[in-house]
Swiss-Prot record:
Organism, as annotated: Sudan ebolavirus (strain Human/Uganda/Gulu/2000) (SEBOV)
Similarity remark: Belongs to the filoviruses glycoprotein family.
Residues carrying covalently attached carbohydrate according to the record: 40, 204, 208, 238, 257, 268
Keyword Cell division: no
Subcellular location: Secreted
InterPro entries for the chain: GPC_filovir-type_extra_dom
Protein name as annotated: Super small secreted glycoprotein
Disulfide bonds: 108-135, 121-147
Pfam family, one: Filo_glycop
Signal peptide (residue range): 1-32
Length: 319
């Protein structure tokens, strides 16, 4: 199992090799290349050899497929913003393509959405599809929605990245990142260009400190998912929520969670307590540009008190 972990790109070797590679972005909208199709829970993945111009290659060993995350291009990664990039369509079969290596993702998503009648909006993952294994934050959302279509696609034509497999659709209950597939053509084959994690490392591993990161989970409830106007609630506990109405960072949500607990503002009844953020709150605190450039979040008592005084201005209690 461990030997099947997602291959990683060593940053130093990637930078050195970048002068000698051609990067071809495989966007489904831009290129009409044949892809594998999910049929009856089986995966048929097109061989890469059939997709390249062989007169440009001395050997197909020079060709490496890599998953690149959209968050590196600066897209908003909070749940309200991300869900606006996804939409439902009918009559279009899912397509998949495999890739050999991938980046670590700062933000991944995991959806469990039901229709008003209780049926599932999203299909289960086909056999062999595992969640994206390198996520700093996993945004787990449950809820309901009209889900007007058979499958949830990316409106910009990007892929949903799973463990070494990119799909055009979202699968239920599986971690994924948004991204595209690039083909790297190396000047000469290098066996060490793509390195595998330790052989005993688990695929969905979160605790081994040797990987220099740990996965944190944030939970949400979404109402009217897939419609033009939806409501996203950040879950503090089973009866306490915060309504999210603007872009924000994961670090801000953790600060919010800590502040509500610190000031004991949890629901103390069987009803639901829903906090509404003050319009003057800065939700961009602790933004991370990339893994290597982490800004220290301001975990001070002064900050907590200021946020507390401001965001508790409004609240809504439902029973």
């Amino acid at each position: 199992m461990g030997g099947l972990s997602l291959l990683q790109l060593p940053r130093d070797k990637f930078r050195k090799s970048s002068f000698f590679v051609w990067v071809i972005i495989l966007f489904q909208k831009a290129f009409s290349m044949p892809l594998g199709v999910v049929t009856n829970s089986t995966l048929e993945v097109t061989e890469i050899d059939q997709l390249v111009c062989k007169d440009h290659l001395a050997s197909t060993d020079q060709l490496k497929s890599v998953g690149l995350n959209l968050e590196g291009s600066g897209v908003s990664t909070d749940i309200p913003s991300a869900t606006k990039r996804w939409g439902f369509r009918s009559g279009v079969p899912p397509k998949v393509v495999s890739y050999e290596a991938g980046e670590w993702a700062e933000n991944c998503y995991n959806l469990e959405i039901k229709k008003p009648d209780g049926s599932e909006c999203l299909p289960p993952p086909p056999d062999g599809v595992r969640g994206f294994p390198r996520c700093r934050y996993v945004h787990k959302a449950q809820g309901t929605g009209p889900c007007p279509g058979d499958y949830a696609f990316h409106k910009d034509g990007a892929f949903f990245l799973y463990d070494r497999l990119a799909s055009t659709v979202i699968y239920r209950g599986v971690n994924f990142a948004e991204g595209v597939i690039a083909f790297l053509i190396l000047a000469k084959p290098k066996e060490t260009f793509l390195q595998s994690p330790p052989i005993r490392e688990a695929v969905n591993y979160t605790e081994n400190t040797s990987s220099y990161y740990a996965t944190s989970y944030l939970e949400y409830e979404i109402e009217n998912f897939g419609a033009q106007h939806s409501t996203t609630l950040f879950k503090i506990d089973n009866n306490t929520f915060v309504r999210l109405d603007r872009p924000h960072t994961p670090q801000f949500l953790f600060q919010l969670n800590d502040t509500i607990h610190l000031h004991q503002q949890l629901s103390n009844t069987t009803g639901r307590l829903i906090w509404t953020l003050d319009a003057n709150i800065n939700a961009d605190i602790g933004e991370w540009a990339f893994w290597e450039n982490k800004k220290k979040s301001l975990r001070t008592t002064t900050w907590r008190r200021a946020v507390f005084r401001s965001f508790i201005a409004q609240r809504d209690r439902r029973r």
